[in-house]
Each structure stands twice: as C-alpha cells, then as structure tokens.
UniProtKB/Swiss-Prot annotation:
Keywords: Activator, Nucleus, Transcription, Transcription regulation. Residues 37-68, 101-127, 255-406, 431-502, 568-623, 644-691, 705-758 are annotated as: Disordered. It is found in: Nucleus. Its main location: nucleus. The gene is FLO8. This is Transcriptional activator FLO8. Residues 270-285, 318-340, 371-396, 460-480, 584-593, 660-675 have a biased composition (Polar residues). GO terms for biological process: regulation of biosynthetic process. Required for diploid filamentous growth, haploid invasive growth and flocculation. Putative transcriptional activator of FLO1.
Length: 799
C-alpha cells in the first residue's frame, strides 16, 4: 500500500519508496508551529481592538449640558425649529413636528395630543434651554446669516453688514501680511545663521521685513557691543549661499547664480548695512536686489542701450557720431535725390586729418580719384540715389552721411546749424548765398557779404561733396567717400543766379510722389533748408505740407532733365506731385542763391526767355491751403489769353492781379488767377478782384486780408497810409495791415536793378484759402514771364 504525498499536509508520512529524511521533517514541523503562533497573535490583536472600541463606546459622557447640546446638534436644531413654529402661531404644525421628532415639551406646557413629558419614553432627551427671542432665535439667526452672505457674495446686503464684512476683511489682510512678513523674516534669519552673521538678536519680523524691503523705519535691532568687530565664521558643512526663493526681485546680473559668494559681513548684526555694501556685478540669491539701469560699457553686446561714444566697432577711421536721442538716422530712401547741397565732408579721426594736411600734390590727387564715387539716380526710386564705385558694374544704394565740418561766422548761423544737425542733415550755411526772404534771419545772408574768390578751374568745384557708404557683395564695411572734386564726366555750370522752388513736403511719405528730376549735368545732393521766420500777413497760421516735423526740401529748377519736362507747355509731369516751372539751360550752384544780384548776362537775357507755367496743386486731404509767393521785378500774365503783361510796382505802377475762375480749368469751381473780366464772385469760395480789394476801405474776405508792402532799397515805405484791419470777432485771427484807398497815388518810383547788381527788395503776394472745395483741393495756375532768374524766389505751401 502506497501513500501519496499531499502538499497541503506537510506532516504526512512519506511513502516507503522515498527515503525518509529527519531534517525535512523538522523544517515542516517548525513551519507549522510558526503558523499556529501567528494565528494566535492575530486573534489577540483583534480582541484588543474590540475591547478598545467597547471601552470608547462605554465611556461615560460629560455631565455638562452645553456639551451634550453640541454633541447632539440635530436635536438642538429640532428644538429651535419647534420654538420658531410655536412663536409663529403654528401650534398644530409645532405639535405634529414635536411628535414626529420625539421632542419633550416644557414642564408647564401640556402636549396637544399626548400625556405630559414625564409619561414619554425615557430615551427621549429633555427639552433644552432655547435662547428666548420675540420671533424665535432661528429666524433672527437666519436673517443675520442671509444678510452677511449677500454682502460677501456681492449681492447687496444692509449697510451694517457691509461695514462688518469690510472690518473682517481688513483684519484678515493684516493677519496675512504679518504672517507673510514673519515667514520672510524667519527665512532671512535662518540664512544669516547659516552664514554665521546672526548673533541672537531680538528682531521684530515686521521691522526686519520692512528694513530688507527698503522701507524707512526705526531700527529693528538693538546694537550690542558696538565697538567690537567680530569676524563672522561660516558654519562648517553648511553652504554659504541661500537656497530659498525670496520674492521676485529682478537680478541685475543674470550670469551670477547660486555659486556667488557673499561679500564681507558688517561689523555687527545690523542688517541695514548689508544691502548697500553689495556690488552690482555680484549678487547673492535671496537678497533683494533692484534692477537699476546699468551704465554702458565697451563689452556691451548688441541689444543693450549704449552710448555711441563708448563703442567703436568700425574697422575704418570713422569716429563715433552722437545721434539725437529722439531721432533716428536717416536712410537714403528717406531723402529725395534731386536736391543739391553745399560742400561738406564727413568727420575724420585725428590721424586721417593729419595725413590729409601733410599729403599734397599728386598723391592727394590720386587718392581723390580713387575714392570718388559716381552718383547716379535710381531708375525706379526717386528718393534713393545709387552709387557706382570704380571697378564695379553694379549700382548700390548710397548711404548719405550727415556730419558737419564747417563753422558759420555768426551766432545765428550756429543756431541754424544746430537745428540742421538735430534733423540729421548737412551744413548748408557755410558756402551759400543770401535770399531776400531770409534777410536778417538767415546766416547765408551774413556769409554772402564776405568777398568770395572767383574760381577759375571748374573741376575743383564739387556738387557731390557728401559722403556715401557702399556695401559690397561680401558684406564688408568699406566706405567710399566723395571728395570735393567732381567726377571727370560731370559738367558743372558756374551760373550764380538760379531760381529755386522750396516745397515743404514729407520726404518719406511722398517719396514716390516726388518730382522725379534726375540730373544729367550735376550730381544730386541732400540738404535741409533752414527754418525761416517770415511775416505772415494773413490771419491763418502756416502749416508745413505733409509733415509737421521735417524741414523743407529745396529743389533747383535746373536739375530736371528733358525726359520730365515738356518744352511746349513749359510744365513738368509728375505723378501726384507738384508741378513747377523749369529752365533746363540754367544750373544751380546753391539752393539758397535765389536772391543774389543779377549778372550782366542775366540782365541781357531777360527778353530772350520763353514764358513758363507754374502749376501748383495742394496735397490731397488738406482743408486749408495757403500759397506764399515771393516775386521780384517780374511780369505776371494773368491768363494765356491775356498777352499784355503787367509790371510789378516799379515807377508808380500798381500791381493788378485778379483771382477768379480760370477758363482753362475743367475741374469745377476751382479758383485760380484769372482774367480781369472776372471780377464778381459767385460764391464764398470764389476769388475776388485784388484791384477792388486794394481800393476798398473794408475787407472783402470774411477771415482774410491782403497785404502788399512795396519798399525801396533804403527800407523806406512807399505806402503813405497803412490802416489796421481786423477780422471777424468770431475767429481769433491776428490783425493785418491793409493799404488804404489812396495807395495808388502815393507810390513813388522804385529803383530798378542795373548791371551794378543793386539790391532790389521783393514784392510779396500771398493768396489764402482761394477756391477751397470740400472733397478736393484747388489748382493754382500762375503764369510767369520768365525774364529774370531771380524773379521767382520760392513757393511755400502751408496748409
């Protein structure tokens, strides 16, 4: 008979086929004993837990009635509900609720549907004492609770509830602030202890936190042993730096992190001296460091604001330039290319200036030839001239410099030069001539009084004396500088007297609308016209065209090629730009040479010139436009149909110019200079007869006046009687001077200009608010018999 070993019974007898081993039997026996002991321990633990639970349940409760009420909250609520129902005269409801909730009644109160409370079951709790209120404590409690709940949830509430809620919030904020400052002070104290800088000072957390935040308060620590200077010894094994994240102060030096070492501690435990002793470049994480603006240094990379004088990353001799803080450097696209300028060179360093003074002769000539760049007009962009460097076949945009070397000869000139520097323009006052509109205010008038040397060699004159910077294909910073010598293929005329037109235009916005005048005789130059102060005899102020902050742009009439000039009509075709008269045979040497005396050749050629037209259109969107025209000893043709020219007031002749609807215009009621037959206006916006205006004693324009003052070279007024005329009281306009009715009889003979180049003062004609239309601006057609180069001084659009 064989026995089968069962794994579930290890103590079973093994079969006879298998050898019996005493060691295996012992192991099985020990495991059985361990299991038995474990089961007994588990039973004992369970019994102990049950006993503890029974003891907790069987513990005697507190004999205090208040404690019983708190432990039995539901019964208390039921009692208050029963009290509320009783005081609300709901007796049947209260009796039914008391019966269902098993509530006892008062001793003196008999139940409605049952015996007294003594006969009730003993398990029911006795009726506890309820706060006696007229309408029931539950109702009053609920009323207060609901009022405060509405106040806290922004649903209204009574005034007292709102005041109470604000007081509670204020107390909570103060506690929160004090708690946060105490935590902050504890962190700082802990950090000081770890660094060995704390000597068991009694510190108020509020004072310490305020002190570390930089607020001026009373000293938080009472100094002990002031005369002693203990050396702080860091604790061994502890890190020196702080690892806590203190409130978010911006670190002035982000490269210094947790590896920075704290500076030497102050002599005592006063924390007021720790913050200021820190270096800006060395920060300890955890100390409040404010981000003050750092001073620029030479190691300042791109991106940090730095003064131009502190760094010089250029590879050439170019010295740093201080640009204005509120203005950007003008790009070549921001400037027109049809404006000449006077000679000026960019600033050079001391070494280059010394070399330029020492070297002369052939070496200097060769250097000038090598550095000369031919400036050509761009094919598509009228505002960005292109330069062609010697040896290259590509044209690159020219970068126009704005460095001034010339020094004017008066304080007024210095002021104007400083204004030109602010706008980033070049000096145009060092070699320019005077203008009749700038007499007494322009430095060019003072400079023109000095005797100038006659230049015999025209090759020495330079019309492209502005520095240009070209960028090659490899991206190098090579600078090509135009010297004072003109290119060999450039022809420059030495005519001193050339009329010019100054238009106040925005160079950036009206770049594409600028008159594309590309010169094939002289190179274009960039300059800025000086700010002039001219007497405005009209009641409306003057506003620049297009831009209110940029200087006027001066353009010579001779810098226009034949491609843009119509010889038949004498007009210039420009896209949405101003149209100006042109004389392609006359070149300009300076934009301010409009008032120089006429030479003998110009005097002889007065009768040989073809009449030209000046068609001026104001910019789109201007509600008020003023046209200031300055003429000198010229003839005005009021219309093409009128062939009889009328002289300006020379020798007693009276200026007669009529303003009205132009018969040549097909644009509606746009008023221009018209024939003398149109004398009666048909609307408020139409023109008036100037002759009738001069001979009248009152103003015809509602808000305007006409002023014409003809003076002799001796600055004596030929007008016998000038009366002051004021405008309407509704408009705050300045009073103007209007000639009286006898102006025609009191005009004396005026000295005419001869070959001796006598100074002849200009005659000012100002037309204001002529033919204004609501949607589109007017067109002004001014026909000039171009018999003198200096007749047409300038046209200034202000609107």
């Amino acid at each position: 008979m064989s026995y089968k070993v069962n794994s579930s019974y290890p103590d079973s007898i093994p079969p006879t086929e298998q050898p019996y081993m005493a060691s295996q039997y012992k192991q099985d026996l020990q495991s059985n004993i361990a299991m038995a002991t474990n089961s007994e321990q588990q039973r004992q633990q369970q019994q102990q837990q049950q006993q503890q639970q029974q003891q907790w349940i069987n513990q005697p409760t507190a004999e205090n009635s208040d404690l019983k009420e708190k432990m039995n909250c539901k019964n208390t609520l039921n009692e208050y509900i029963f009290d509320f129902l009783t005081k609300s005269s709901l007796k049947n409801t209260a009796a039914a609720f008391a019966q269902d909730a098993h509530l006892d009644r008062d001793k003196g109160q008999n139940p409605i549907d049952g015996p007294k409370s003594k006969e009730n079951n003993g398990n029911q709790n006795t009726f506890s004492k309820v706060v006696d209120t007229p309408q029931g404590f539950l109702y009053e409690w609920w009323q207060i609770f609901w009022d405060i709940f509405n106040t806290s949830s922004s649903r209204g509430g009574s005034e007292f509830a709102q005041q109470y809620y604000q007081l509670v919030l204020q107390e909570q904020r103060q506690e929160q602030i004090y708690r946060s400052l105490a935590v902050h002070a504890a962190r700082l104290q802990h950090d000081a202890e770890r660094r060995g800088e704390y000597s068991n000072e009694d510190i108020d957390p509020m004072h310490l936190a305020a002190m570390m935040l930089g607020n001026p308060m009373a000293p938080a620590v009472q100094m002990r042993n002031v005369n002693m200077n203990p050396i702080p010894i860091p604790m061994v094994g502890n890190p020196i730096v702080n690892n806590f994240s203190i409130p978010p102060y911006n670190n002035a030096n982000p490269t210094t992190g947790a590896t920075a070492v704290a500076p030497t501690a102050p002599p005592s435990g006063d924390f007021t001296n720790v913050g200021p002793t820190q270096n800006r470049s060395q920060n300890v994480t955890g100390w409040p460091v404010y981000n003050y603006p750092m001073q620029p240094t030479t190691e300042n990379p791109v991106g940090n604001p730095c003064n131009n004088n502190t760094t010089n990353n250029t590879t050439n001799n170019k010295s740093p330039v201080n640009q204005p803080k509120s203005l950007k450097t003008m790009h070549s696209t921001d400037k027109p290319n049809n404006v000449p300028t006077s000679k000026s060179t960019r600033s050079r360093s001391a070494t280059s200036k010394a070399k330029g003074k020492v070297k002369a002769g052939l070496v200097a000539k060769r250097r000038r030839k090598n550095n000369t760049a031919t400036v050509s007009a761009g094919s598509t962009n009228a505002g960005s001239p292109n330069i062609t460097t010697p040896g290259s076949t590509t044209s690159e945009p020219a970068m126009v410099g704005s460095r001034v070397n010339k020094t004017p000869r008066s304080d007024i000139a210095t002021n104007f030069r400083n204004q030109a520097i602010i706008f980033g323009e070049e000096d145009i006052y060092s070699n320019s001539k005077s203008s009749p509109s700038l007499d007494g205010a322009s430095p060019s008038a003072l400079a023109s009084k000095q005797p100038t040397k006659v230049r015999k060699n025209t090759k020495k004159a330079s019309t492209s004396a502005f520095p240009v910077e070209s960028t090659n294909k490899l991206g190098s910073n090579s600078v090509v500088t135009g010297k004072k010598r003109s290119p060999p293929n450039t022809r420059v005329s030495r005519r001193k007297s050339t009329p010019s037109v100054i238009l106040n235009a925005d160079a950036t916005k009206d770049e594409n609308n600028m008159l594309r005048t590309f010169s094939n005789t002289i190179a274009p130059n960039i300059h800025s016209a000086p700010p002039t102060k001219t007497a405005n005899s009209l009641p409306f102020p003057g506003i620049n065209l297009g831009s209110f902050n940029k200087p006027a742009v001066s353009s010579p009439l001779s810098s226009v090629t034949e491609s843009c000039f119509d010889p038949e009509s004498g007009k210039i075709a420009g896209k949405n730009g101003p149209k100006r008269a042109v004389n392609s045979k006359v070149s300009a040497s300076s934009p301010l040479s409009i008032a120089t005396p006429r030479s003998g050749d110009a005097q002889k050629q007065r009768s040989s010139k073809v009449p030209g037209n000046v068609v001026i259109k104001p910019p789109h969107g201007f509600s008020t436009t003023n046209l200031n025209i300055t003429l000198k000893n010229s003839k005005i043709i009021t219309s093409q149909n009128n062939t009889v020219s009328q002289e300006l007031p020379n020798g007693g002749n009276i200026l007669e110019a009529q303003v009205g609807n132009d018969s040549r215009s097909s644009k509606g009621n746009r008023n221009t200079l018209s024939t003398p037959e149109e004398k009666k206006p048909s609307s408020n916006n139409q023109g008036y007869d100037f002759d009738a205006l001069k001979n009248s004693s009152s103003l015809l324009f509602p808000n305007q006046a006409y002023a014409s003052n003809n003076r002799t070279p001796n600055e004596n007024s030929n007008v016998a009687d000038e009366t002051s005329a004021s405008t309407n009281s509704g408009d705050n306009d300045n009073t103007l001077i209007q000639p009286s009715s006898n102006v025609g009889t009191t005009l004396g003979p005026q000295q005419t200009s001869t070959n001796e180049n006598q100074n002849v003062h200009s005659q000012n004609l100002k037309f204001g608010n002529i033919g204004m239309v609501e949607d589109q601006g007017p067109d002004y057609d001014l026909n000039l018999l171009d018999t003198n180069e200096n007749d047409f001084n300038f046209i200034n659009w202000e609107g």
